[in-house]
Amino acid sequence: MENFVFNTTPSIVLQTGGLAKIADIAGRLLGKRVVIVTDKGLRKLGLLDPAINALEQADIAVSIFDDVQADPPESNVLALKDHILAHEATGVLAIGGGSSMDVAKVAALIAKSGETLNDIYGVNIARGPRLPLVLVPTTAGTGSEVTPISIITTGASEKKGVVSPLLLPDMAILDADLTVGLPAAVTAATGIDAMVHAIEAYASASANNNPLSRSLARNALQLLGSNIRTAVFDGQNRDARAAMLLGSLLAGQAFANSPVAAVHALAYPIGGHFHVPHGLSNALVLAHVLRFNLPKASHIYAEIAADVFPELGAVSTEKRAEAFVEKLASLSRELGVPQTLREVN
């Protein structure tokens, strides 16, 4: 048995309607002054209201930072840090997609530790400590609630990462109620994104690839593959929404410990230069990268093919990997995901 180290978020709660019980679930952890991090769109939709009401009823003071932008720039992180300090926050609660969670993770760290962003870019450079942190995803895709990674846009288009176990939150809450209103297009792109995380984690050439990550990746693919169509075409189905959230989380745990590869390497510059959402950037290049990798990775893709498409279990091993790649491309088209950069302007 190979040796490995595995790190993840220590407390995970899957509860439909859980946000309305946030004071009971995480009130003691967050303390008496909480900053909620989100974007203006989610605030306008009222998705924060259950959390605000629950916290205030528990005599916990709430301040809201709703200026998070897509592909968050450094200024976003610094503005949140200043907001946290101005309100003397005892805890940070992020409710949103990957951008909100990434911003919250870094700001909760530097607001407490006094480090600057330039101090902590890179791998395992941050010293900490950080404020108590709870993350609540509103999309099933990024897995940021269980990853020690935040990606920040520097300058016009360059992206830099902060990678540190200090970015793992104290708790992640998966609440399907928060995802039932997601448009089909967002559900599809973020769902494919989660699949990318699982596929790349399973196939990773990293020395950190390990049996636990591979097991999580396969479980993620089974959940995502069997629920993504329902989540896209019947968005009010809470069972499918919860399954997608869990699949995304498992994929996040997998790639947090067994790093992603070429799909993400190509997706980041697409997002940085053309402002294409990260999940969609991954979806655009997925099939192309898998086809390129087939000569060296066909045995790996054959192992996971039936996790997503059970009918491929009856296909010969020699043909299964190629069929897997083509069926992924077909699934992406079926879900309405754009296939070319031209389609996303």
PLM-predicted stretches and their roles:
Residues M1-L29:
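N-terminal amphipathic/basic leader segments beginning at the initiator methionine
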Residues G141, L249-N282:
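Glycine-rich phosphate/pyrophosphate-binding beta-alpha loops
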Residues I149-S258:
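Carboxylate- and glycine-rich phosphate/diphosphate-binding segment that chelates Mg2+/Mn2+
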Residues S113-T138, L166:
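Short, acidic/small-residue loops that bind anionic groups at enzyme active sites
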Residues L19-V35, A54-A58, A86:
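Glycine-rich phosphate/diphosphate-binding loops that line cofactor/substrate pockets in enzymes
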Residues R43-E115, I125, R229-R241:
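N-terminal small/polar loop signature for handling phosphorylated ligands or for N-terminal nucleophile
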